[in-house]
A protein has these predicted regions:
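Generic start-of-chain signal for non-secretory N-termini
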Residues: 1-22, 29
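Short, ordered loop/turn segments at secondary-structure junctions
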Residues: 40-42, 242, 326, 339-340, ...
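Duplex nucleic acid-engaging cores and interfaces of nucleic-acid transaction enzymes
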Residues: 52-55, 62-323, 327-430, 438
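Long, highly charged, low-complexity intrinsically disordered interaction regions
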Residues: 64-82, 92, 426-524, 543-570, ...
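Structured, non-catalytic alpha/beta "coupling" segments that mediate domain-domain communication
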Residues: 76, 90, 103-104, 229-242, ...
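A glycine-rich phosphate-binding loop feature that marks nucleotide/adenosyl-phosphate handling sites
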Residues: 180-187, 324-328, 384-386, 410-417, ...
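Single-stranded RNA-binding regions, centering on S1/OB-family and related RNA-binding modules
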Residues: 551-555, 559-720
């Protein structure tokens, strides 16, 4: 890596040491995956995690894009014969793309402007003379340039003005100052357009009808909301800077002390025109684009963090679950699943209008029969259409059962997408889309990660303004989040679907399908080493993937840990030193392992960080990180918004976290909002400092708007 590139990356990643950045890039260049590096190359990187490694990768791409653009610009100017050593040095020293573009602007091929025409008419010497003029007789000088193309003095002066205005607008120094000044002191103004109020019938953008805020204080969600309002032709948006301060700067920068008064006024007017026609609009476009890019990055980050917490929700293990896909006219689809997610029974009941009364009366008995026949312990109700009516029906029904039966409201976003997919058709070819959806809802409760990876992450609605975000950047981030979650948890090699396996480090959909096919043809895997026999799974893929694949009850006990086979030798040494033969995972074995002085086992190949990981894995073979996370909130009774009163204490599940707060499901039809100012008594900017998707939280009702069906909540206990 070039020294300048490393310096640039260090500036963007100040919390990391140069050695860490270089080591991470070297490992990535060798074809190692981020999960593999984070887990198994801690000594090399100084224990960088997946998020830090992804940040290094992203910054490296930015640096490469900058260097590529610098070379393209240098080549283009060189081909024009206008590249000087000083200009080359300026371009190569630039650390931002907009600086490179500013330097390139005077040499950039552009459409034939008025200034270009004036140059072709031979008026550039006149513009240069006026800029430096110590004489007041501009008309006299302009008369010298009258020709067939320039019929009079006024035409000559207008041409000189065009040349000066364009030249001023292309000054990299002026553009840099104006950009920084506007960024620091400019304001974003939004107003309602004529007729916009009629278009905004529900008042979604009402708070932006007469809105202004400093650019430096614009929140990402406001930027995206204003952009959406502008796109809908409801809002008019502009960026304003103090024109007098801008003009004073331009005058100071451009007008020579020795200039004659008439020449000075001419240059001032040209500068004012340059700002009005060229500089102002260009910088406004640039800053609007920058604001949008930053807002998009933040929104994508929010989406990614919410998705991660959704994927990492604790699974419900060892329970028979009934998936309940609510509907009105077409009936509610039910799917009974055994503790491993295997389908036992599907049914359709009609508990809601417009179904005939006899069908509605039969629905309760049908549900009770399924619960008793299959000893259902939990019911997963999708949160879509007819969800709250179905919740009420389920709550009333389970009261008639003597043993405990609970229900959970499950986010069904994307369930219909998966149910209509080829994968779902292949698994359940005889079932309708709706019945497959009930299966998906039930499995989401049993193992959220295994089920949610089957659909596109974009279909899971846990973001803000996600449909306005750049699709490619969103996909890259969300794919990385899914990969991080799947590899942190690990998967059972003998039960995992190909969709889950495809997210394991080093694997893809093709290799994952090959693994499943090999498993179906040859029986269950009894050793990780058998992976080497899977078609097209080469040494590199094996190295990257094997540590994240678990085998329960296999030939090698270490295969049910996240210890990499490359470390089996040292793992066995540790077991031997602790005097452990076969009782791996027992409390006694864990105690003996934790008492070891592992520093004596440090070598060139195995460092302290890896040894600590190995000890943790040996103490808890087969561990699932998600088991320590809060379980879903189980309910037996139902609430309505009419039941809520200010001051009432409730328990709820965080469904979504956005920049301005968190949406909490407290058991009514619509999620309540905890504004960021009500998350904690302390001042915080980012709600994710306090809450995450899936958290179980205590809240108090602040206000209830029955007309708009909105509930304001607080996590700060009243009168505390």
């Amino acid at each position: 890596m070039e020294k300048n590139d490393l310096k640039l990356m260090s500036q963007q990643l100040p919390e990391l040491r140069d050695r860490q950045i270089e080591a991470a890039l070297s490992l990535l260049e060798e074809g190692n995956t981020i999960p593999f590096i984070a887990r198994y190359r801690k000594e090399a990187t100084g224990s960088l995690d997946e998020v830090q490694l992804q940040g290094i990768q992203e910054q490296w791409h930015r640096v490469k894009n900058l260097r590529d653009r610098q070379q393209t610009v240098i080549k283009a100017i060189e081909e024009q014969g206008k590249l000087t050593p000083a200009l080359r040095m300026q371009i190569e020293a630039a650390t931002e793309l907009n600086v490179v573009e500013d330097l390139y602007l005077p040499y950039k091929k552009k459409r034939r402007t008025k200034a270009q025409i004036a140059r072709e008419q031979g008026l550039k010497p006149l513009a240069n003379w006026i800029f430096m003029a110590k004489e007041n007789d501009l008309d006299g000088k302009a008369a010298e340039f009258i020709s067939q193309d320039v019929p009079d003095v006024q035409t000559a002066l207008e041409g000189a003005n065009e040349i000066l205005a364009e030249t001023i607008s292309e000054s990299s120094t002026i553009r840099a100052w104006l950009r920084n000044y506007t960024k620091q002191h400019g304001e974003l103004i939004a107003t309602v357009k004529k007729g916009g109020q009629e278009l905004d019938s529900e008042g979604v953008y009402q708070q932006y009808y007469d809105f202004s805020a400093p650019l430096s204080a614009m929140n990402s969600y406001r930027v995206l909301a204003i952009n959406r309002g502008e796109k809908a032709k409801i809002l008019s948006v502009k960026i304003l800077a103090d024109e007098q301060i801008v003009q004073n700067y331009l005058n100071f920068r451009l007008v020579k002390k020795s200039s004659a008064q008439n020449a000075a006024e001419f240059v001032k007017n040209a500068a004012a025109e340059a700002y009005k026609r060229f500089l102002g609009p260009a910088i406004e476009r640039e800053l609007r684009r920058e604001l949008t890019e930053q807002a998009n990055e933040q929104a994508i980050k929010v989406f990614g963090e919410n998705l991660y917490h959704l994927l990492m929700q604790a699974p419900i293990k060892g329970k028979v679950v009934l998936g309940f896909d609510p509907a009105y006219r077409t009936g509610c689809k039910l799917a009974v699943l055994d503790p491993n997610g295997k389908l036992l029974k599907v049914a359709v009941i009609y508990p809601h209008k417009p179904a005939p009364e006899n069908q509605r009366q039969q629905a309760e008995g049908q549900l009770l029969q399924l619960i008793e026949d299959y000893q259902v312990e939990m019911i997963a109700i999708g949160n879509g259409t007819a969800s709250r009516e179905s919740e009420r029906f389920v709550a009333q029904t389970i009261k008639k059962i003597k043993r405990p039966v609970y229900y959970v409201i499950v986010n069904e976003s994307g369930a219909s997408v998966y149910s209509a997919s080829q994968d779902a058709r292949d698994e359940f070819p005889e079932l309708t889309v709706e019945k497959r959806s009930a299966i998906s809802i039930g499995r989401r409760l049993q193992d959220p990660l295994a089920e949610l990876v089957k659909i596109s992450p974009e279909a899971i609605g846990v973001g803000q303004y996600q449909h306005d975000l750049p699709k490619t950047a969103l996909k890259v981030e969300l794919d990385a989040v899914v990969e991080r979650a799947v590899n942190r948890v690990g998967v059972n090699l003998n039960t995992a679907s190909y969709q889950l396996l495809a997210h394991i480090a080093g694997l893809n959909a093709t290799l994952a399908k090959n693994i499943v096919r090999y498993r179906n043809e040859n029986g269950r895997f009894t050793s990780r080493m058998q992976l080497k026999s899977v078609p097209r799974l080469g040494p590199k893929a094996f190295q990257q993937a094997v540590g994240f694949l678990r085998i329960v009850d296999g030939d090698e006990p270490l295969d049910n840990t996240d210890i990499h086979p490359e470390s089996y030798a040292i793992a066995r040494q540790l077991l031997q030193a602790a005097g452990i033969a076969s009782e791996l995972g027992s409390p006694m074995a864990a105690q003996q392992l934790r008492q070891l002085d592992i520093k004596q086992f440090v070598s060139e190949k195995v460092g302290l960080a890896t040894l600590k990981d190995i000890i943790a894995s040996l103490c808890e073979p087969g561990r699932d990180l998600r088991d320590s996370l809060p379980a879903p909130l189980l309910r037996q009774d139902v609430l309505t918004i009419e039941d809520l009163k200010p001051g009432m204490q409730l328990q709820g599940t965080v469904r979504n976290v956005v920049d301005f707060g968190a949406f909490v499901d407290v058991g009514i039809k619509h999620d309540g909002l905890v504004h960021v100012s009500h998350l904690t008594r302390k001042f915080i900017k980012d709600p994710r400092q306090v809450v995450a998707v899936g958290d179980i939280v205590d809240v108090w009702v602040l206000s209830v708007d029955l007309k708009r069906q909105r509930v304001q909540l607080t996590m700060v206990q009243p009168n505390e």
